[in-house]
Amino acid sequence: MPITKYKAAAVTSEPGWFDLEAGVVKTIDFINEAGQAECKLVAFPEVWIPGYPYWMWKVTYLQSLPMLKKYRENSLTVDSEEMRRIRRAARDNQIYVSLGFSEIDHATLYLAQVLIGPDGSVVNHRRKIKPTHVEKLVYGDGPGDTFMSVSETDIGRVGQLNCWENMNPFLKALNVSCGEQVHIAAWPVYPGRERQVAPDPATNYADPASDLVTPEYAIETGAWTLAPFQRLSVEGLKKNTPEGVEPETDPSVYNGHARIYRPDGSLVVKPDKDFDGLLFVDIDLNETHLTKVLADFAGHYMRPDLIRLLVDTRRKELITEADPVGTIATYTTRHRLGLDKPLDGEKKEKEATKGRDSEAEEL
């Protein structure tokens, strides 16, 4: 039986720019803060660890190389002690954590998200299906078995998407079909429309993401929608600028874009430009009854006999057997990365405890 009323938080803060350890420490601090505030869920922005490489939108390929090398060196692997520290923080605070991070797997980076449960387990691990525009110079495409978004939890059906995935009608349709009740629309850092230069469309600026795309997601899905955003300081602007290039001096256009929306698309809270921290919301899952009774696109307000979405969640292997009779062992990304293993050997400890109890009974 899910908890229908609880407190949740969205992070709007500056990441530990391209410093893995600093990012992990700051992540744990926010998890602890949300836990102390009695939240059941805390949501972080897209690639919060080690920060969104906004410099890729502004510099040449050659200028980017030293920064890209450092970025790769400070990206996070899911089966690492850094990730286990974050998982322990979730367990210690009995809280769900939606974390966006740059995942390095073998030699490729992915725009990844995990949903960590209050027991420290990884409930869901997903990768952005298609990096946006110049992001393709940094990240790879997520495979078929890592793009599902919605997880069944005791705080409702929780979904996660990265950046422009939140405007993808097919991904929205998929999440609706899964009965999503709470959505994390994780955004990176990018400037407001004050910085718009023709012919660059308004689509490519933060205000439409915050004030159009995100509430539209809430309206169309009828889900509580948390939109965590990264921020920038003057020092952060320097760290996002390669050597030999004059950094920007006004970070204000990058700030104040985080939002939380109700299932009907109405605004719950938005930060001031200079606010850095957690935005809070009191979620009531029963409020979605009021929106779903009007428009449930997974039920009474859809015609699957006319319109259907084809979804393929299989992992496509790099090497396959040419002989259709022969087979090559397959595996899921989740299994290969060790995400189906218990945190800190909890399973072994439980088995040992069970064994000691049996011995005591025999005595």
Swiss-Prot record:
PROSITE patterns: CN_HYDROLASE, NITRIL_CHT_2. InterPro entries: C-N_Hydrolase (IPR003010), C-N_Hydrolase_sf (IPR036526), CN_hydrolase (IPR037544), Nitrilase/CN_hydratase_CS (IPR000132), Nitrilases_CHs (IPR044149). Induction: By cyanide or metal-complexed cyanide complexes K(2)Ni(CN)(4) and K(4)Fe(CN)(6). Residues 338-363 are annotated as: Disordered. It catalyses: formamide = hydrogen cyanide + H2O. Oligomer of dimers, forming left-handed helical fibers. This is Cyanide hydratase. The gene is chy.
